[in-house]
Amino acid sequence: MRLVTTTADLKAYYTDKSIAAPLNGMDKTGFKHIDLSISGVMYKDSPWIQNGDKWKFEVEDCLKIAEEKGFDFCQAHSPYINSFENDEKTEALTVAIRNSIEACKMLSIPHTVVHPIALYGATPNEFLNKNIEYYRQFTDDTEKNNVDILMENSSSKWNPQCYIRTGKELREFVEKSDMPHMHICWDTGHGNVQGQNQIDDIVAMGSELKALHIHDNYGNEDSHTMPLIGTTNFDNVVKGLLKIGYGGDFTFEACATLRRVNAWPNYRRDVKDSDLLSNPPLYIVQKQQALMYEVGKWMLESYNIKVE
């Protein structure tokens, strides 16, 4: 099983908004298999939310850096919004997701993760139908580019009107969507906040589970720390993966283990402009990432899973 981490880990250390920028620091983390974060492209005048091909320059830069540093791309994370309440944002998201699917093809990435979108005031069934209607519009894109989109579990803690929170609900969504290229990404941190027995969730997803977001927390907030810093039972996670014969990657999304001052949802207190210790420097974060690689290797090898 490959150990993977996301470029979102280092994004804050680069003023360049290009999705390629964080790759410049990934070679000092110990990871060679990369989850490419395309989730932060929903900003004003972003090439990703406009018609045209300017966003492809960023993808070409990704290819160049990956070749120079010996990386390969295993999965991606598409942009997202929290709710359908703003039509302009929803339209921009549609363009950005469509471009992210094509970007995956250019980078030989087999799948990209998407989020469920809340429909405020709706029943669970109305929410489900609205999300299916929205994501079905990408059917042709996924087929043309041979790229899967993977729905990720949320939590009622921060989005109480988002009704995709468990393995059973994810499986129901995928089956009801009836899209050949729609499958599942399970987020262990979200599952821990939701209070799930993650063996049961993983078994419920079964063969539809194609990717993971591995991170930890104390069960109260979506803190995105590395494993063993919170209360997630990772024995249950790994046992569940073995039980279903999971064949995907072990992908970390622990981008706030060493927290920056503005890292949601746990913000550093009483920060002043003159403070020198508010944000960890890049080189220390890279060392933390290297430690996380060793933790992941130990976790998998403890269950006789070979690390690639």
Predicted feature locations:
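Active-site-proximal loop/turn and secondary-structure-junction residues that shape catalytic pockets
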Residues: 9-11, 38-42, 79-82, 116-120, ...
